[in-house]
């Protein structure tokens, strides 16, 4: 919305004198900063009202896993879920205000984010109303996610300003790319769905998921800005994607809304993100990575999410094949709880790992 102030200064009589001031809205960096502040302020202001309403409507709050750490049955009992509504509302408001409304990449990523958020919301609704840890059918959920992801990948190949590359770029190697052709649709959908569920699995402790999401969003804000700038993209020898820089504004909105949410999700949490938030944020990260052609880099920057997902896959596979469990409990953050680590120790150490992985992922931009 603010982006249109540039045109108004040129067309509306009397606003010409403000053109030098309004010209700052041309700059993605300025609007990204504005998106961060707006997203944070929105959640700060409306967060308490949302929490009170969710607590009133949910009653007993999110059901706690009976097979999890016994301390959770006491410390987390009665805490409302669906906190992702706070993040998504702040994200959407901030993006609408600060992003270029004519940019197709912004709308494609927003569609994935809200689509995954809607799936997560329904899952949370079933859990709260039935007071069970299981939501609706896993197969149904995966199918819906896959359909949304496939539609988004197809839209990327058709709605971009220039022909969208279907090549898979290999980090650390100069001019090395694998053209996937139509297989790009399946690969891109796998990245988006995988990211959504990986973040979902990570969201098991107070503050554990939101900070790594913010770190990843900040990292991809930088990547999107560079990929959308022809000069920087040429210098770094990464794919130039016209218009992709606008995704930095969306990443800024996520960072701001995440900061606001962390205020209420910090231990002991007043609200949980729920599938509403974790699925949406993961899907958003996946779709941005696909849009800016840094899918493999997402696996590095979001390595913590990959670790959490792999721990579950390995645990399930091991138990089915051998009848034995490799970890005391999966996802892996619960394994460390069973080893005696306190919740703050796990959360802060995982944050540190996320920062290190983000730095490693960003280093791939230059090391080619």
Curated annotation (Swiss-Prot):
Location, primary (coarse class): membrane
Cofactor(s) this protein cannot do without: Mg(2+)
Pathway: Cell wall biogenesis; peptidoglycan biosynthesis
InterPro entries: Glycosyl_transferase_4 (IPR000715), PNAcMuramoyl-5peptid_Trfase (IPR003524), PNAcMuramoyl-5peptid_Trfase_CS (IPR018480)
Topological type in the membrane: Multi-pass membrane protein
GO molecular function: metal ion binding; phospho-N-acetylmuramoyl-pentapeptide-transferase activity; UDP-N-acetylmuramoyl-L-alanyl-D-glutamyl-meso-2,6-diaminopimelyl-D-alanyl-D-alanine:undecaprenyl-phosphate transferase activity
Localization per Swiss-Prot or TrEMBL: Cell inner membrane
Protein family membership: Belongs to the glycosyltransferase 4 family. MraY subfamily.
Protein name per its UniProtKB record: Phospho-N-acetylmuramoyl-pentapeptide-transferase
CDD domains in the record: GT_MraY
Protein origin, superkingdom: Bacteria
Catalysed reactions listed for this entry: UDP-N-acetyl-alpha-D-muramoyl-L-alanyl-gamma-D-glutamyl-meso-2,6-diaminopimeloyl-D-alanyl-D-alanine + di-trans,octa-cis-undecaprenyl phosphate = di-trans,octa-cis-undecaprenyl diphospho-N-acetyl-alpha-D-muramoyl-L-alanyl-D-glutamyl-meso-2,6-diaminopimeloyl-D-alanyl-D-alanine + UMP
Keywords, ordered alphabetically: Cell cycle, Cell division, Cell inner membrane, Cell membrane, Cell shape, Cell wall biogenesis/degradation, Magnesium, Membrane, Metal-binding, Peptidoglycan synthesis, Transferase, Transmembrane, Transmembrane helix
Function: Catalyzes the initial step of the lipid cycle reactions in the biosynthesis of the cell wall peptidoglycan: transfers peptidoglycan precursor phospho-MurNAc-pentapeptide from UDP-MurNAc-pentapeptide onto the lipid carrier undecaprenyl phosphate, yielding undecaprenyl-pyrophosphoryl-MurNAc-pentapeptide, known as lipid I.
TM regions (residue ranges): 32-52, 79-99, 102-122, 142-160, 176-196, 207-227, 244-264, 271-291, 296-316, 345-365
Enzyme Commission code(s) on record: 2.7.8.13
Cellular compartments per GO CC: plasma membrane
One GO term of the biological process aspect: cell wall organization
The UniProt record lists the keyword Transcription: no
Group of enzyme by EC: transferase
